[in-house]
Amino acid sequence: MEQKRPQLKARVDGDYGEFVLEPLARGYGVTIGNPIRRILMSSIPGTAVTSVYIEDVLHEFSTIPGVREDVIRLILNLKELVVKFHAPGPKTLTLRAQGEGEVRASAFEVPTDAEIVNPDLVIANLAEDGKLVMEVRVEEGEGYVSADKHATKDRINSIPVDAMFSPVRRVAYHVENTRVGQQTDLDRLILRVWTDGSAGPQEALDKAVEILRDELSVFGNVEPMPALESSYAAATPAAVYDPATATLPASVYDSPRQPDLGSLSINPQPFPTDQDTPRVTLEGLGLTTRVLHSLKEEGIDSVDALCALSDRDLKKVPGIGERSLDEIKQQLAQFGLALRD
């Protein structure tokens, strides 16, 4: 019986999208869902803050008179800034604030070919005598780029910032059983996508499928390997191994020598796991700014260090409660990682 062609149904609500693909042949739910999820998490282009200049600040470990947040906290807040480009090329955002009160992202002066998606984001809190002047550079890119990779000398005392460009915040998928008529051994793929608002879930999914299609298209243009063809063509029937007639040399059967097992040195190497080689940085886990700051205050600055801790260890970290612990576990699980038992 001919299988029904799969159909895709979508439900998009702002920066959240749910996509259902069915019916699929048994096993194809995972075959399709896993690569799309990996591409969504790693390869969708987006924008991010790459450097910041703050007036009268020389380095990221400084404090600013009249500003409650130190420079590290300001940078963490700026990493949450979401900017949507309407034209290519880096953009410079300028902020000038003075006097008591909150400073929100809406206070930035933004070029006409860009917009801030989250204008209510709190950047800083100023005292009555506080003053904050800064320039923020926003660029386009893919995945995670460390600060040293895009350090710029365009502005003296500019502080480079490690950037997570992906507009996709989280991706989850699972496969269910489904049926069509009497055929019950079919898959239903359910894919859920959360974005930061600079790109919609449908747009991100379309881009992921385009990337996957381009990568697989190479298999449609296979070129012959002359060296391989010539070696096979030159082979005679006698040179081709035939298991029915092949025999070992007589010396193998007649030799009285036995292998010296005592000389063997068995030194097995541990098989590397995802825990040993994290695939993402601490910033790339998608943790909230508050949780990320609490971890870094305790010197937990890598995924490897985080995964070496247990639930009990993390509860001792100031600012980490049950809700924060659940958030950390959920974000680690998205990358196949977990805390120590």
Curated annotation (Swiss-Prot):
SMART domains linked: RPOLD
Region span, Alpha C-terminal domain (alpha-CTD): 268-341
A cellular component term, taken from the record's GO annotations: DNA-directed RNA polymerase complex
Keywords: DNA-directed RNA polymerase, Nucleotidyltransferase, Transcription, Transferase
GO biological process, one term: DNA-templated transcription
Catalytic activity entry: RNA(n) + a ribonucleoside 5'-triphosphate = RNA(n+1) + diphosphate
Recorded GO MF terms: DNA binding; DNA-directed RNA polymerase activity; protein dimerization activity
Region described as Alpha N-terminal domain (alpha-NTD): 1-223
Listed EC numbers: 2.7.7.6
Root EC class: transferase
InterPro entries xref list: DNA-dir_RNA_pol_insert, DNA-dir_RNA_pol_RpoA/D/Rpb3, DNA-dir_RpoA, RBP11-like, RNAP_asu_C, RNApol_insert_sf
Pfam families: RNA_pol_A_bac, RNA_pol_A_CTD, RNA_pol_L
Record remark: domains: The N-terminal domain is essential for RNAP assembly and basal transcription, whereas the C-terminal domain is involved in interaction with transcriptional regulators and with upstream promoter elements.
Subunit organization: Homodimer. The RNAP catalytic core consists of 2 alpha, 1 beta, 1 beta' and 1 omega subunit. When a sigma factor is associated with the core the holoenzyme is formed, which can initiate transcription.
Family from the record: Belongs to the RNA polymerase alpha chain family.
Protein task: DNA-dependent RNA polymerase catalyzes the transcription of DNA into RNA using the four ribonucleoside triphosphates as substrates.
Name of the molecule in the record: DNA-directed RNA polymerase subunit alpha
Organism of derivation: Deinococcus radiodurans (strain ATCC 13939 / DSM 20539 / JCM 16871 / CCUG 27074 / LMG 4051 / NBRC 15346 / NCIMB 9279 / VKM B-1422 / R1)
